[in-house]
């Protein structure tokens, strides 16, 4: 179902100086055809940082490599890692960084995915000059690492915001997505994920407050129509299920 996605697929699309996105998919989750998105950043040292890599494509790899050497690949939460194994095969010198608790998942261990480093709230020296990061916690081992690209004032999320366009979804799903507040303009994560994050609500609210304090101009995330402008206002609306943020 190509209607769910944002063509052209599996190609670099410039967003800001040193920052690109790659739209791909669709993936099917809980019967919903989901568009999926990777973010690509060129760090100050000229190396390339891949956030939530999408399906591997040789031409895409070639185009990214033309920007600089791929040195970092990020699995930002416990759900976004499935395409990394093939990228590792083709980028053997790149380090793979993972959200907390990903390494412990049985499916990940059985896959043979190599995890070189585990992320936390402190940006590592490899990209501290370019990116800030915040771990948003939840129950049941859920963690999502959010990143802020200071030069472009872009916040990079994964599943904390899901903003599906009804016109791109099957007609039968549209009322369900609206009821679940997963479609534009609400842009909330699925109900089960909201429940999981609420299990650690106090810590999650603190983390989200840190993200809002960064005042991002734009917010990129994995699924749906990302916030190209007025990022802080849109983010506050999408995360209001956690509480009121001033």
Question: Where are the regions a protein language model picked out?
Answer:
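Generic, well-ordered alpha-helical segments
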Residues: 33, 56, 75-79
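Short active-site segment of divalent metal-dependent hydrolases/proteases
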Residues: 80, 162, 226
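Cap/insert and terminal regions of metallo-dependent hydrolase folds
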Residues: 16-17, 29, 54-56, 67, ...
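Catalytic core of the metallo-beta-lactamase
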Residues: 1-53, 111-179, 206-207, 213
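Short, well-ordered alpha-helical microsegments
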Residues: 57-61, 81-85, 105, 142-144, ...
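Active-site neighborhood of phospho(di)ester-bond hydrolases with catalytic His/Asp-centered motifs
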Residues: 51-52, 71-78, 97-99, 156-159, ...
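Short hydrophobic/charged patches on amphipathic alpha-helices used for structural packing
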Residues: 61-62, 208
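Active-site HxH/HxHxD metal-binding segment of metal-dependent hydrolases
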Residues: 63-126
